[in-house]
Amino acid sequence: MTDATVAKIPHVLVIMDGIGHREAIKDNAFLAAKTPSLSMMKQKHPHSLISGSGEDVGLPDGQMGNSEVGHMNLGAGRVLYQDFTRITKDIRDGVFFEHEVLVDAVEKAKAVHGAVHIMGLLSEGGVHSHEDHIVAMCELALKRGATVYLHAFLDGRDTPPKSAQPSLEKLDALFAQYPEQGRIVSMIGRYFAMDRDNRWDRVEQAYRLLTESEAVRTAQSAVQGLELAYAAGESDEFVKATRIGDAVAVQDGDSIVFMNFRADRARELTRAFVEHDFSGFTRQRIPHLSKFVMLTRYQATIDAPVAYMPEALHNSIGEYLSNLGKTQLRIAETEKYAHVTFFFSGGREDEYPGEKRILIPSPNVATYDLKPEMSAYEVTDQLVNAIDSGEFDLLVVNYANGDMVGHTGIFDAAVKAVEAVDTCLGRVYQAVMAKHGHMIITADHGNVEQMQDYQSGQVHTQHTTELVPFIYVGPTQAVIAEGGVLADVAPTLLNLMQLPVPAEMQGRNLITLSS
């Protein structure tokens, strides 16, 4: 910034990932934490609660929100009809079973006497996938006479830690209707198959299981394999590579359909299969596939067919501000970097003109309960510097701690995670107030406020359907409208910036400033 440049008034959007609101104190890591900064802000500034789940974010009624959906709604300023909902509707209407891309993958494999390998997160969590979609894809291929092999990635993160058995039994029952035509041939925890932080040693174990049947253990059935994993102290998320029955590996001429609909944790394994110049690890076998199909577009640079292309999204807040010549910053640590960039921009990979991105590496630990502060302090250092610089009209930051540590199910670590975020927010608050700026503090969905699952009796590692905080910090008092949703945040930010709201944004302004 030159001396002649007028310093910009900062407008900061803080996304406290996975921090929802729950009145009950029991098993509530947020209420157990010491949060003097947030308490002070709630005393001095207006605050409310908004919805981040179900139909309010374009998901089925009662479905918990997630980070991808949350950030897309936050950036879009409108409720977006999610891939989960689109695909479920197509299955219900029968359209899915005639889908050109999916049918082509099956028929191409059949034409060369190859098999169809279906892989994905076998879970009813509905965050990265849904088991009903996997069942439908198996039915599509089986009814067309294909040989079908299922490679099950187990959840235990968006579902209770030990909850995979009913899902495995559901698929076993389906395959029993088609004797000798298909079965579950492998399973592995999502910790290995669905990394998103370039931990290629994990992904390699999943890849070798699929391409070489290289396994830590073998079992005669999927349920037996699960029992062996539990006996070894592994929960679903961490189940080691398990071969089911006789060895089945992906062969030349086979097709693969990856049934995850959320992109971020599907990219790495997909790249291992389709990239010619892949360098994550040394591939012992590289099958020459008839087709590799991504259920949705995991990344624009991945050269593979896509069943459900993203719907065009115009005038997200990022695009709109860029077109007006405004400047913006997106900042997060690795675990949530894609969310404040790709997802917040409605599925756009590239920066907009006037946009700057800062990526802070997440700590290299096995699970984040070992370092619950993660990289929050480093994120805050960079954010405060950016606020002080006067360079940016809008600054968007994600604090990953509540969600990533909440997913571990470790209560004491989750408390420390919340306290780390609160400490950081105290610093951000001081920086914003010093610049007479505006700040909205909210969350994409809940998680850390419920750490025990009362139905299963297990620790609660998944998201919740609770409302999330909405706090306004600024130089004047204000009134916040009730009944807000995540899609209202972008129009509200534009209102604070004294900019007209584009017609595409159907959300409403939630903040009325006192004159």
Curated annotation (Swiss-Prot):
Write one Gene Ontology MF term.
Answer: manganese ion binding
Instruction: Name the catalysed reactions.
Output: (2R)-2-phosphoglycerate = (2R)-3-phosphoglycerate
Q: Which residues bind substrate?
A: H128, R157, D158, R190, R196, R262, A263, D264, R265, K336
Q: What is this protein called?
A: 2,3-bisphosphoglycerate-independent phosphoglycerate mutase
* Entry similarity comment: Belongs to the BPG-independent phosphoglycerate mutase family.
Binding-site residues, Mn(2+) 1 = D403, H407, H463
Enzyme class comes to isomerase
Q: Does the keyword Isomerase apply?
A: yes
Under the subunit heading, UniProt states: Monomer.
User: Which Enzyme Commission numbers does its entry carry?
Assistant: 5.4.2.12
- Cofactor stoichiometry and binding remark: Binds 2 manganese ions per subunit.
What Pfam families does this protein map onto? iPGM_N (PF06415), Metalloenzyme (PF01676)
The role this protein plays is:
Catalyzes the interconversion of 2-phosphoglycerate and 3-phosphoglycerate.
The record's annotation in NCBIfam families points to: pgm_bpd_ind
Biological process GO terms, please?
glucose catabolic process; glycolytic process
Q: Kindly list the residue ranges recorded as spanning the membrane.
A: none
Question: For binding Mn(2+) 2, which residues are annotated in this chain's numbering?
Answer: D17, S67, D444, H445
Cofactor dependence is on:
Mn(2+)
UniProt xrefs under InterPro entries: Alkaline_phosphatase_core_sf, BPG-indep_PGM_N, Metalloenzyme, PGAM_B_sf, Pgm_bpd_ind
Q: Name one GO cellular component term.
A: cytosol
